[in-house]
């Protein structure tokens, strides 16, 4: 995976519309989300490559050390519409679903525990170089595709079950209210 540091900008660069700056708040659980609180900057302030669908967005620094290292695959953004912010890293790889799934495993949790500086009120910080220098066992490209596809399907099934549960809870709440 190739990682890149995020955009730093001045308050005067912020606009109501423009290029969206992806931040830690765009990672909800393990999903990519766009929100009303997203920040936009004037295009002239952008001096890095834009984020693309299937890039991996990683929180590199945060006031809460437990949020450092959270990650997700970027989906559903138009070309040239967003960049990652200064406290974020962006990973690009041929097999994003495999790499993102591997970042949910024990090696990554241990890596975060060992390498994230912070605590006692300090801002948690994940070094790009520390992440780049991690050595992990990587299966062949074909195996990565199969494993990545499996986890993508699993994520999809989990999402479907969460939606079903949410809808059922609404139905049961309505039934309960009608019974009363």
Residue positions per predicted region:
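Feature detects amphipathic, helix-rich regulatory segments
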Residues: 1-180
């Amino acid at each position: 995976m190739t990682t890149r540091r995020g955009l730093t900008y001045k308050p005067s660069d912020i606009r109501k519309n423009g290029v969206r700056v992806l931040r830690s708040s765009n990672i909800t659980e393990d999903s990519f989300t766009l929100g009303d609180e997203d920040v936009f900057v004037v295009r002239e302030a952008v001096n890095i490559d834009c984020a693309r669908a299937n890039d991996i967005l990683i929180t590199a620094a945060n006031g809460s050390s437990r949020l450092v290292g959270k990650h997700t695959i970027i989906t559903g953004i138009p070309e040239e519409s967003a960049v990652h912010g200064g406290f974020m890293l962006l990973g690009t790889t041929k097999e994003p679903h495999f790499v993102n799934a591997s970042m949910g495993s024990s090696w990554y949790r241990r890596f975060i525990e060992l390498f994230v500086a912070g605590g006692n009120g300090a801002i948690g910080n994940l070094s790009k170089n520390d992440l780049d220098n991690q050595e992990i066992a990587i299966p062949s490209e074909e195996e990565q595709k199969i494993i990545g596809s499996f986890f993508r399907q699993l994520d999809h099934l989990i999402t479907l079950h969460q939606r079903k549960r949410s809808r059922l809870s609404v139905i049961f709440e309505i039934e309960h209210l009608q019974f009363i």
